[in-house]
Design a protein with these regions (language model features):
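Glycine-biased strand-turn-strand hairpin within the trypsin-fold
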Residues: 23-93, 98-115, 125-128, 134-138, ...
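Short conserved beta-strand and strand-loop elements enriched in small hydrophobics
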Residues: 60, 104-110, 157-159, 327-332
Length: 350
């Protein structure tokens, strides 16, 4: 009799433990959209995220400026892409390639309002441009600076593909830190399988809370001709987009430090016993500031401004943050000997 009473209790306890493992949000009394749909018999939906984020994603158009005012007003409007309202003050982030060459920029909000936009500044290297409109009661995209994109996160891409109207596509973050994919040499893409089509560029990649994860920018297909892969799109991480936006608002341009080194990452393996066991950048070409400082081809750059070199991307980002004209120490390995040099930071050519 006791066994008959205890057995259902034991099964219930095991089931409860399994549910807590599968749905950890139940431990603190909250539920994800997915778990709510299971327990409440509701369809799974990201409509709340769309309601939060979509109003802040705008359509961007251009219009040719004609020398005759009346004809200028009647000039055809060309769809360019999308943009994201980042501030109630009217600042909008889009891609550099979306508005490059546009004579007059028109911004259309989802509530039907239309505004002329003024360019604040652009950065070709990161493919970011900032526009400004004069308007009140603007929706702003939510930004959570403490939430980093993680592989496997569900994301929504919001934009105006092919000018058919605002469209939402869904996928996951497939990878982070992708580099070397852009014609503008930008680094650290977010890769997603959410569809990013022509016209989505400059739009928002958001998480299931409607928070901005990145600025949609391109698909892998652009460089592959007829060999078009599916499910490979890229976005500029929010942190980088915000950083560039703030610099453009403040200065109208982005000034980066530069030392004039081309090189390859140097990371010796167990089979290279005759080489030094260090991480660094094997210099293939030195020019400008590095040449003047005494850096030579085949040197291994191992330290910049008292910080060890771990990767090309990290070191170039570090140098980019240094103010041109600043003198910093660097250490190179040359024929097995450490040599300290002083280098004057230059300005990265645009």
């Amino acid at each position: 009799m006791l066994k008959k009473i205890l057995w259902p209790i034991l099964i219930g306890a095991v089931l409860a433990i399994v549910l807590l493992i599968i749905f950890p949000s139940l431990r603190n009394g909250t539920q994800s959209d997915f778990s709510r749909s299971i327990f409440n018999d509701e369809p799974m939906s990201y409509s709340n995220a769309v309601k939060i984020a979509a109003p802040a994603v705008v359509n961007i158009y251009s219009r040719s400026i004609n020398s005759v005012p009346k004809q200028s007003q009647d000039s055809p409007i060309t769809p360019l892409g999308s943009g994201v309202i980042m501030s109630e003050l009217g600042y909008i982030v889009t891609n550099y390639h979306v508005v490059d060459g546009a004579e007059q920029i028109i911004v259309a909000l989802q509530d039907g309002r239309i505004f002329a936009a003024l360019p604040v500044g652009s950065d070709k290297l990161v493919d970011i441009a900032v526009l400004k409109i004069e308007a009140s009661n603007l929706p702003r995209i939510p930004i959570n600076s403490s939430r980093d994109p993680k592989i496997g996160d569900v994301v929504l891409a919001i934009g105006n593909p092919y000018n058919i109207g605002q469209t939402i596509t869904q996928g996951i973050i497939s990878a982070t830190g992708r580099d070397g994919l852009s014609p503008y040499r930008r680094q650290n893409f977010i890769q997603t399988d959410a569809s990013i089509n022509h016209g989505n560029s400059g739009g928002a990649l958001v998480n299931t809370k409607g928070e901005l994860m990145g600025i949609n920018t391109l698909t892998f297909a652009k460089n592959l001709g007829n060999d078009v892969p599916e499910g490979i799109g890229f976005a500029i991480p929010t942190a980088l987009a915000v950083k560039i936006m703030n610099k453009l608002i403040q200065d109208g341009k982005v000034i980066r430090g530069y030392i004039g080194i081309d090189g390859l990452e140097f990371a010796p393996t167990q089979n290279t016993s005759d080489l030094p066991k260090v991480l660094g950048i094997l210099v293939t070409n030195a020019e400008g500031p590095s040449l003047q400082a005494g850096v030579q081809a085949n040197d291994i750059l191992i330290m910049v401004d008292n910080k060890p070199v771990k990767s090309i991307v990290e070191t170039m980002d570090q140098i980019a943050e240094l103010k041109p004209g600043t003198i910093v120490p660097i250490i190179v390995l040359r024929n097995g000997e450490k040599i300290q040099l002083q280098i004057t930071i230059g300005q990265l050519p645009v």
